[in-house]
Amino acid sequence: MKFQLHCHDHHARRGTLTLAHGMIETPAFMPVGTYGAVKGLSPDELQTLGAEIILGNTFHLWLRPGLEVIEAHGGLHRFMHWDGPILTDSGGFQVFSLGALRKISEEGVRFRSPVNGDTCFLTPEESMRIQRVLNSDIVMIFDECTPYPVDMQIAEDSMQLSLRWAERSKAAHAGNPNALFGIVQGGMYESLRDRSIAGLYNIGFDGYAIGGLSVGEPKLEMQRILSHTAPQLPVDKPRYLMGVGTPEDIVRAVEQGIDMFDCVLPTRNARNGWLYTSQGVLKLRNSRYRLDTSPPDENCDCYTCRHFTRAYLHHLQRTGEMLGARLNSLHNLHYYQRLMSDIRKAIEAGQFEQFACRFSG
């Protein structure tokens, strides 16, 4: 892995990340393909939209279809016919989401498979083994996602466990030529975030992610922790904000020096008939669009906006036609990729602050 910073505008950074399967221009947004597919879209469509890297999920791919299937194809890239870089989450957040169905110990996490009820045991070593089979360009350490809200002692215990798991992840990753990213935890406590960063830095990683945000905390709390944490991450390594977020969240995070993002919002909201546009969010189920013959966004040149009207998309949403979800997803991911392109251009021109002010209205 090679990360090169080209320029910056205050804290906002413009760079290039070179990985085994290609190059990524940063700041970058990664569409989420949890099960090895971005819902409803083909790899060719994703490339046409401008996506350079996508995210897969270790936990879900391990359970279904299973490693033997992916290994038979020679890795996740061939299995899903995507020849660009792939980042895989370690499974820590998904285990956290199981709630009472899982039992955490020093060794790892024991839980019942949500697929068939089998007892499963996921450890840092097993997560690294799975991601090696997947041949992920960016491997994430196995960590515990600190819940919200929790008191400081619980958050500290969780952060310390994640640091011990980070050491084990690093040791188990040895011999894998792909990149390994550490994940900063510590809940809503700045001092714990500081100690997490110091511990991860001492272990040494190819990049650093901020985890444990967008887990139910108020927006102002997320911004407080982000603005405290991001500037402390190593300058010469890529910085990844996990699971965030809205277009506004992304612009604010770029202001803090974040380079990489992922979020399910553009595709999930597309399936629910919410489109991101230059004029704000358009909610297609609203009856006001039944006779609206204008495109979803007058300022967008995506396939959906060039060929279809709001009235047609309203009709598809109301009737539950799967084409509606596809067309909406094409538009929303195009919107996100164009946003990242505009952000990169603004940083290059030294105009990012002005861009951010215009964007926030």
UniProtKB/Swiss-Prot annotation:
It catalyses: 7-aminomethyl-7-carbaguanine + guanosine(34) in tRNA = 7-aminomethyl-7-carbaguanosine(34) in tRNA + guanine. Gene3D superfamilies: Queuine tRNA-ribosyltransferase-like. Binds 1 zinc ion per subunit. GO terms for cellular component: cytosol. The keyword Glycosyltransferase applies. Pathway: tRNA modification; tRNA-queuosine biosynthesis. Keywords: Glycosyltransferase, Metal-binding, Queuosine biosynthesis, Transferase, tRNA processing, Zinc. Residues 243-249, 267-271 are annotated as: RNA binding. Zn(2+) binds at C300, C302, C305, H331. It comes from the Bacteria. Its EC number is 2.4.2.29. InterPro entries: ArchSynthase1/Queuine_TRR, TGT, TGT-like_sf, tRNA_ribo_trans-like. SUPFAM superfamilies: tRNA-guanine transglycosylase. Pfam families: TGT (PF01702). Catalyzes the base-exchange of a guanine (G) residue with the queuine precursor 7-aminomethyl-7-deazaguanine (PreQ1) at position 34 (anticodon wobble position) in tRNAs with GU(N) anticodons (tRNA-Asp, -Asn, -His and -Tyr). Catalysis occurs through a double-displacement mechanism. The nucleophile active site attacks the C1' of nucleotide 34 to detach the guanine base from the RNA, forming a covalent enzyme-RNA intermediate. The proton acceptor active site deprotonates the incoming PreQ1, allowing a nucleophilic attack on the C1' of the ribose to form the product. Homodimer. Within each dimer, one monomer is responsible for RNA recognition and catalysis, while the other monomer binds to the replacement base PreQ1. This is Queuine tRNA-ribosyltransferase. The lineage of its organism: Bacteria, Pseudomonadati, Pseudomonadota, Betaproteobacteria, Nitrosomonadales. The gene is tgt.
